[in-house]
């Protein structure tokens, strides 16, 4: 009995002070971290190229990481380009190629319109010249009713008829001229030419400027025996044909 009491006393004395105050099973160990239980995450799946693969697959993870990197790279490049575009100095509208092309197109259209107008004006001018010449020719051919002569003496003047038919009868031609013009003819001479036509020289009995012009206007351009004849007033010295 005494031995047990001695042993119990030794055991009590051998304990530390903290062991004597707090039971051993209630002492929390200091400095020892509790092990956390690893929670196993649920495994997911992803679709790659039409196939269902595990989300924890290394290839899938690498592709996702590469996609994120590419996305960030594209965003940074777009931001960089946007900053360069904003910092770019504004060009003058006149220096733009599109403006230059439009301006050149406008100039070309203006030049084309001006060229067409010039060509039209040239044609109109040419047409007017032709009309004036035609009108002037008709006036010359038709003759004016007003006949003026500053020389009162027309004794040396006569009428020359060209492009008559070969072998025309002088007396018949004289009678026709007198009957139509009502002018007396003193002499008429006809000569056949090697060219195939005949020429007549007509001298009036009482030549005056008015009577000569009257006969010329009546017979100039007349159709005689199928030929269009011409009549001119000439001086006796200028008619060098021998009859």
From Swiss-Prot:
Molecular-function annotations in GO: nucleic acid binding
| Origin superkingdom | Eukaryota
Q: Where is this region: Disordered?
A: 71-120
Compositionally biased region (Basic residues): 78-88
GO biological process, alphabetically ordered: mitotic spindle elongation
InterPro entries documented for this protein: RBD_domain_sf
List Phosphoserine occurrences by residue: 96
Q: Which UniProt keywords apply?
A: Phosphoprotein
UniProt keyword annotation of Phosphoprotein present: yes
Q: Which GO terms describe its cellular component?
A: nucleus
- Miscellaneous: Present with 2140 molecules/cell in log phase SD medium.
This protein is called Uncharacterized protein YHR127W
